[in-house]
Amino acid sequence: RVLCPSLTFVATANAIKYINAEPIFIDSDPHTWVCSLDALELAIKKYKPKAFVSVDIYGQSCDYDAIQELCNSHNVLVIEDAAEALGSEYKNKKCGSFGEMSILSFNGNKIITTSGGGMLVSKNEDYIRKAKFLCTQAREPFLHYEHKELGYNYRMSNLLAAVGRGQLAKLDVYVAKRRKIFQEYQKAFSDIPGVNFITEPTSSKSNNWLTTFTINPKKSTSNRNQLIK
């Protein structure tokens, strides 16, 4: 069993299913939109999972001090889904650096793009070595072609990698621009009842790669489609 938030893109849960593990979904905090620490603790005690996949949703970092303390005390591995959080920070440390393994996305709609694909990050060399092996069709290190286990073609081309690396120098500029866009929307909609934006904790700095908000139908006179127009 592997825990993950229900508020996430389907790829988070798919990664769990790919290895025939069972995803257990947990609720998110209504203000920060990241995983609820209370829900996480209850799920750990009830389901005794092998791992927890945290999700830095819309660039918002999770509370990793609390998560790591809780998970470490129950021998639960933390995997950080930082697909949306390149350039985001938690206590002045970059998202993508908190899990035993972490992933970043370079999909076409992300803050830096290679048109697709992403990156696996880990301080554990064995994890990286195994990932490189699997992503190149699990070919054994022989002169001839020999494969003893199922592999995948998850390689990124050198050209696309160069495109991504070229954008890294401007990452801070991109983050500042996205944060400004978020603040402009927040200001423009501040007088509309029932519109709520994600709350950024003082310990976090989001890249705000995607500006999102919720609408309380009991308080708002406008619906989603009207606000989009």
Give the positions of each predicted feature.
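Short active-site oxyanion
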Residues: 1, 116-117, 171
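PLP-dependent aminotransferase-like
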Residues: 1-73, 77-82, 89
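Glycine-/small-residue-rich active-site loops that bind phosphorylated ligands and cofactors
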Residues: 31-32, 59, 110, 203, ...
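PLP-dependent aminotransferase class I/II
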Residues: 38, 42, 51-55, 64-66, ...
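Conserved active-site segment immediately N-terminal to the catalytic lysine
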Residues: 80-114, 143-148
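Active-site PLP attachment segment
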Residues: 97-135, 158
